[in-house]
């Protein structure tokens, strides 16, 4: 049983997947599935896979793709509860795994686990994974998972102890979930620090303990996996081979599963209801949806993305010399939010899988604030007044407001997707009504979410004024997610040139007040108090208009009706239990 500090888990709202109609059994299969008995499995991830090292990845699609190979100590299940993967059991105070003072957590590892190359998995690999990510020169994109960790110790080959700098009310961040799996020390030993990006073989074909191993990888195109002969569960995985093909768009992925049946699984179907509903009616496949904490938002760039700045473009500096010329004004940010009609957006573009929201932490219900709901009502005239009173006026009659020679002209970027382009068009219209000129840019999704350090078009580079994407917490406790807005000493948590733009604070917002409140939150044990502090952190983000939350989204994918075993998950990788997937019998 969990101790009382984890009662927050009981407050999570229900989430689940659609029930598929019973299809005809697949012919020529053994009565009982075994390892590699069910042939090939095909998937479309229209945001193509860029890298398979989750610590260098910046997009959900890459974390999912890596999760077939690399495993954490524990996954988070569809209800948000931790379940053992490489760990023997979930550590708690009751079983002695979590210390009474909450300053350490100890995992006992499963025995006789092998890497896919046949080498034994040990606690040394866990320790190395921490050392790899926290190395100051490693551009580790998920370092916030190790926030507050002071030491990771191999007590013996099958026991690892994690020590925190203060009581950790939610100690399950490090090494758990898709963002924090274990990598092999032997393979990555020479890939530490500045060398991390140079290890192309390790980063595209990691050796893992999971049900599959990489057979072929072509960046931004295709990944082919084959079953791992050393996987510890003797009759898994059931599919002999898995192919993840990239490219196209969400509607095309939906069509390939639901209309033509040529693909088994289509991920992230951000498709308008009017388009996807007729496909579902054909009865070939099923839409799987679940609700966690995913929020579509417009992020504000607090730094100047002007190309004329060269190496300082969108680069945070402690002295504020690269601050954004007009988005640094909170009145401008607030006016942009006031001008948006989130209800129209939700109704037209999302249907039952999306609700308007003013919070970046929109779920689970226990941590959802009600302090920002004024944004649910569009206020165009109020936005105009706010800009006028702040000195932003259209003095030359060209329809664009200006102040001190600076015009309100915004470059608004996002990934290529019909729903996102229609969202852009709506927002462009609403912003132009208040005197803000808006240019739209869309980038191929595999590039936008790819994290290529050589590309100027990745969302972590953020070379636009605002950008739009969806994100949310990866467990029912949002501590790791909320760490994404920490500034830290010398801006260490901010994505900037010195870390290859690979930290998690993409907006480049730096608030000592937020950092101090987060420290209090991280040290608070009582679940009700933690929930209130999580709301306060959300409110600081919302009321400073660090980003503009738009839609509280469900995760939506589709599977062909001959596929079973899927347990749709919004708190972790959708492929977290892929070893159990099989053909219907």
Locate predicted features:
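Extracytoplasmic/periplasmic ligand-capture domains
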Residues: 7-10, 14-34, 76-78, 95-96, ...
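Bacterial N-terminal signal peptides that target proteins for export
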Residues: 1-2
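Short aromatic-glycine motifs in intrinsically disordered, low-complexity regions
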Residues: 72-81, 140-141, 195-204, 364
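Mature extracytoplasmic/periplasmic domains
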Residues: 191, 353-372, 556-560
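Active-site-proximal polar cores
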Residues: 550
